[in-house]
Amino acid sequence: MDNKISPEAQVAELELDAVIGFNGHVPTGLKCHPDQEHLIFPLGCTILIQAINTQEQNFLQGHGNNVSCLAISRSGRYIASGQVTFMGFKADIILWDYKKRELLARLSLHKGKIEALAFSPNDLYLVSLGGPDDGSVVVWSIAKRDAICGSPAAGLNVGNATNVIFSRCRDEMFVTAGNGTIRVWELDLPNRKIWPTECQTGQMKRIVMSIGMADDDSFFYLGTTTGDILKMNPRTKLLTDAGPAKDKFSLGVSAIRCLKMGGLLVGSGAGLLVFCKSPSYKPIKKIQSQGGITSITLRGEGHQFFVGTEESHIYRVSFTDFKETLIATCHFEAVEDIVFPFGTAELFATCAKKDIRVWHTSSNSAHRIGVTAIATTSDCKRVISGGGEGEVRVWQIGCQTQKLEEALKEHKSSVSCIRVKKNNEECVTASTDGTCIIWDLVRLRRNQMILANTLFQCVCYHPEEFQIITSGTDRKIAYWEVFDGTVIRELEGSLSGSINGMDITQEGVHFVTGGNDHLVKVWDYNEGEVTHVGVGHSGNITRIRISPGNQYIVSVSADGAILRWKYPYTS
């Protein structure tokens, strides 16, 4: 009986401790919960529920790929989220219970991508819009967790519908809009049908980016790629007015929100946040933010609201003085590296293409400084740097002076990883030319070269420093003898994709790896077996580190996410 159990069965799950990041590219992805205490937003395939005051986090995990849209019911009881998947495959919608933080139902009908979701005002129905390959609109019963009916979202001679919004008063009416199409739908429950009526805009042809409904259902407003706003009447299905006539919003109206007191909050693709009123739509108040605005979410009636941008900034704005406060910021592109300072687990630094950020581990907060990437000796007197051309440079650093001691030219391709021995007399560099070189830092020359048929991505010294472990694009983890460069053993590190990051504990008992399979794996060094697996990244993991003192594992990925995991063993 025992021999049938797969080795994967004994692998424990790694506990996710904290997430730093926000995917600002999801339209209306940032939501303030009706309890006014929590922000809800997607990051990769995870949905974060974060307390506004205490920053405490909960995670909703269940999607197999990136979350593409998010909706919260008006009562706050339910959250719905949709995902992207591969062409031809079914994309899931997941219905979550907010209070219990658990999955209620998985709704699968659409193919490829879920474009948008909306709840009816009394939590009776959920409407979903499929992506370009799917093109259908489906109404789901929340009580039965099943589809009521569906229909093609747009006519034959127009583009795709990309936005959906429910009526604020009636459970039977909703609006879809997109490229050249604006439709008001009526749900006919006894016959299980939805009936569309095309809205007339005359000569005006527009691509709709965002949509907002007035509280009394008197009008709905459409933000367009042209940079103007259309005001439509849902009863007559006619255009009431459009504007502004001049000075349209640059890069389109990407977010729109109706306020109870009258007027609109409008966000543009150029990062301009504006309060304006029909029919002129001229700015009454305005703020410039960093990155195109993708979400505006009200806290309560709108006395305070939150704004999310493409550059992963979250702002809090109070309506009365219209001043913004940056409350969260993180990398919006691939994170390239992580490093902990010597002997402290309190801080760590991450770098992306354009910025370096230093984070405080327990509070996950950051400040911005310059841009570079280096490896240092523990006495801080030398810096060893590797370049894209394969050169390894040793620099001597004094209080006022920086001197290049030696340029070591052996590698033929870029240096991907540098590790320094504890006594600062030796270092190892891994390169994508398929070599690892062990350098003598006293005589500044090569000690040993290791060759393999792979592009090396990472290397680690075992703490006793007579062995090194390497991994790279061939998915194998190799143990090597430092003295003569011979291979001791090879492990199959991943079933799919390169291993990009690796780190080893101070005792050398366990090590961690991460790569293109999006999994964080904890290994037993001597047994060569996986003991724990962490699922949470949806981009390729680029680097991984264990904090000094073995409290946390921090992993970063190509989608800009930083995940902090609880280290599974007590040191």
UniProtKB/Swiss-Prot annotation:
PROSITE patterns: WD_REPEATS_1, WD_REPEATS_2, WD_REPEATS_REGION
Transmembrane segments: none
Entry keyword annotation includes Cell inner membrane: no
One GO BP annotation of this record: flagellated sperm motility
Listed InterPro entries: Quinoprotein_ADH-like_sf (IPR011047), WD40/YVTN_repeat-like_dom_sf (IPR015943), WD40_repeat_CS (IPR019775), WD40_rpt (IPR001680), WD_repeat_EMAP (IPR050630)
Annotated SMART domains: WD40 (SM00320)
WD repeats: from-to residues: 62-106, 109-150, 156-195, 288-327, 330-364, 366-405, 410-449, 451-490, 494-533, 536-571
Predominant cellular place of this UniProt entry's protein: cytoplasm
Pfam families for the chain: WD40
Coiled-coil zones: none
Assigned protein family: Belongs to the CFAP52 family.
Protein name as annotated: Cilia- and flagella-associated protein 52
